[in-house]
Amino acid sequence: MGPAEVRRSMATRTRFWLGLLALASLTHCAGNPTALTHDAALAPGEGVVLLRVVGNASEPWSQLELAPDTGGTPQTVFAADFAENSSGVFVGKLPAGRYRPVQMKAALQTGNLVTTLEVPLEARLGRFAVEAGRVTNLGTVVYQEYGAMVKMHIKNAVVRSPAPAPSAALLHSQFPAVAAAVEGKPELGWDDPVRAPSPQLVQVLRDGRGQVRGLNGASLAQGGAVWAGARLGALLVRESVRAPWRRIDTGALHEIMAVAPLPQDRILAGGEEGLVVLSQDRGRSWTRLSVVAPERIVVFVGGTASGAVVLVAQGADDLQVWMASDPRSAWRQIGQIATARDRREGVVPGTPAGDDVVRWRTLQHPDFVALTDARLVIYSDERKLSTFDFASQRWDSVETPFVAHHTLAMPDGHLFAMPPVGASMFGSSDWGHSWQKLDYFTFASAPAFASDTTGYLAARPYGTTEIWRMMKTTDGAKTWNEQSELAFMPRKVIVDPASHALLALSVQGETFLSGDDGKSWQAAN
């Protein structure tokens, strides 16, 4: 993507999200007979259906059409606002009867237009029954795209998996009246249930993990390796900034949102639906840990200087913070912090059943949690900065004089914060109790530092065009100088402290490498 394409892409982002918002609003304003509501029980003759979809879709799925075998108009079931990022769980109520999936729909940007991608499901998945007062759990479907989009069509595979959808957790957290009505009743499923992975599923998972999307929570570990989470339970690691990506499979289907390498060849990772997994042999085998409820997304994991481990789990309106002396030992909750909704850059509108007001997926920006040698740092509810002191085991919370979009905490405790649009960068050396104004940008990524004084960030300096620049500081972030114009839209910058080699991750999921102080860039796998 060249500079002209970057300008066009940025200019159309607002139109894209407004189009999605309008699409979601229309579906709910018309009223949806399949929608479940928080306090309403099922009507006589109604049952519940759930289906989870995972994989490498271009956009999140928003609608699932189910046709009754007796004919008539297909029923539309919407994706729930549950603990998912790229995955989706469809849930709704249907009159008792027999049904088959007809198609899935997703809103898709094509040039300057927002259109609907439709994937036919007829004869690809099977049939199922809905009975009054019971749940039909259709489990998990894996979706994989092949090749490029041509005239709103793309070659794809849709395959059933034996993994169940999270019915109990979803119903209890969002629809308690329905959960009480179906409690203790055996769940239904497909007419021909999937009891083991089919050869087609194995192949689709191999294809999907081979071109897996997502570079979540990318960070530089001690020793110089770069780690990131991805879809379909995959981790990505570069043994150095200059090395290629290598994939590690955890065996899960959830998207991995956070990963932390630990001493003694251990790896801790977390993601959708409360997933927490541990490897003690550098990724060759994995054990799932029970730490947080499945209605939360694990958005951060890390190891402290003392050898303890910390994780942060995002809920609908709060964060839970957990800590353990060892991942295999008992975890204890050390904090619960209210959060602001709708802060994520490039937020994706969800269409939770039963809501006439469009809500949004609630993951915060991935740079809002950081570990230092002395404290855990969390920026959460608008102007609130919270730090947990490992020595005293106490929280300290302060109100910031700005709304931050990125936050960064250095190992020595120095903090940096970047407001979302057109404001100064700020720095603090007293855990957020006082702040100093630094340089001024229209937009910027979180900075990456090679030393106390030398750092890099991708930014649009104030007063410039929409082209992003790579910037460098040699005075501890007080002033920044341009190194180069970027032909891609950056999301995160990582620097190797030893060589000053730079790795940049783009919004489109691409990876770029610079070995000359950010002056030139090459695509890197």
Question: Predicted segments — roles?
Answer:
Residues C29-Q75, A106-R209, F512:
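Primarily secretory-pathway and cell-envelope proteins
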Residues S86-R98, K105-A107:
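Short Pro-Gly-centered beta-turn/loop motif in secreted/extracellular proteins
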Residues L205-G233:
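Beta-strand-rich domains and repeat architectures in extracellular enzymes and scaffolds
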Residues D207-G210, D249-A252, S290-A293, Q336, ...:
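Surface loop/turn motifs at the tips and blade-to-blade linkers of beta-strand repeat domains
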Residues R213-G217, E255-V259, R296-G302, R341-V348, ...:
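Repeated scaffold domains used in trafficking and secretory/extracellular systems
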Residues L220-G223, L262-Q264, T304-S306, L371-D373, ...:
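Residue-level detector of Asp-centered blade-edge/turn motifs that repeat once per structural unit
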Residues L232-R247, V277-V292, W322-Q333, A338, ...:
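Asp-box/BNR beta-propeller loop motif
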Residues D317-W322, E382-S386, G422-F426, T465-R469, ...:
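Structural motif
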